[in-house]
């Protein structure tokens, strides 16, 4: 059982972050590439917002940051869990 508290920041493994809610967003490959440049240059400035669904951390906010991290081959990203349903 994973203990979560709203507002906690946790580093989570990029490979284990789910993106099933991404289908509700428009994607822009150029914006993802630009985000990768920003992430490389400045680091991660704000956490992804995630929720736990079926024992998977699903991204709710931060899809460009997740795509950029995958482009760069990063292992972890700072994430803020939320319990809102």
Model-flagged regions — what are they?
Residues 1-82:
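Short, charged/polar connector segments at secondary-structure boundaries
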Residues 85:
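Basic, flexible Lys/Arg- and Gly-enriched helix-loop patches that mediate nucleic-acid binding at interfaces
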